[in-house]
Amino acid sequence: SAGAVVGAVPSALLGAHTGIDAPLFAGACAAVAVALSPSVGWLLVTLAALAWVGAAGDPGTALVLAAALAPVPVLLAARPWLWSAPALGPLLGALGVAACAPVFAARLGARAPARAALGALSYWWLAVAEALSGRRLLLGAPAGVTGRASWQGSLPAAFQHALEPLCSDGRLLTAGVWALAAMLLPWLVRGPSLRWQAVGAAAWAVAMVAAQAALGGRFDLPRQPAPVAVGALAAALALVSANLRVRAHRRPNVA
């Protein structure tokens, strides 16, 4: 459930800042909160985690996390069970296949607005994760983002040295590319045969890689790692996902 899943995210943060058994605490909070509703559980656990991080002496970190989490209930208001799904962005980035995130966004979001929102949020969470960790998951943090040690203890410093560079750099337009890719994917792989579906998936992947390359050239961004290989993997996953969806729709109902 959404409350239980989100409990794992703040618990890792809590464990990094306190000596208390944060996973146990977060899990207990999530279990109680999710009994009320997934949306209430997600909000309560998230607010508790942010308050805990701030009280532990890292208000700047709490602010950056809040900026990552705040758009989720707004853009996915009708689908609280997807509120933790943007974590797929940084997770796939850690595996070196971040550009596959729109495939999962398209698969999880039933309708076009939800698919677009999930695609955009997946990149936003990845960008915030790069700023927090200092690791390159796709493009890396903008040059204006300094090490977390320089801003984690100050709200103004976090805004100036983390959030402002994140939002003023052209790489944030990647969120729009992912949103569009996730929204269009199911429509492009609806061909009458596997061959047409494969053509649609390949065209979709080529267009996405080309759009990201165009952004890189326009804003002088770092080159994405192995774009052709990751694009091919994304096309394959898109094709598999399309066929799984078709089979699920054709499955007869058994009483």
Question: Model-flagged regions — what are they?
Answer:
Residues 30-40, 73-82, 106-114, 182-199, ...:
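Cytoplasmic membrane-interface segments at the C-terminal ends of transmembrane helices
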Residues 3-8, 25-34, 93, 105, ...:
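Alpha-helical transmembrane segments in multi-pass membrane proteins
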Residues 37-38, 49-57, 76, 118-126, ...:
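Juxtamembrane/interfacial segments around transmembrane helices
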Residues 91-235:
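Generic multipass alpha-helical transmembrane bundles of integral membrane proteins
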Residues 31-32, 47-117:
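Membrane-interface helix-loop-helix junctions at boundaries between adjacent transmembrane segments
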Residues 1-57, 66-74:
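Core alpha-helical transmembrane segments of integral membrane proteins
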Residues 17-26, 39-43, 58-65, 81-85, ...:
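Short, aromatic-rich membrane-interface segments at the entry and exit
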Residues 44-48, 65-69, 82-88, 106-109, ...:
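A cytosolic-side transmembrane-helix exit/cap motif
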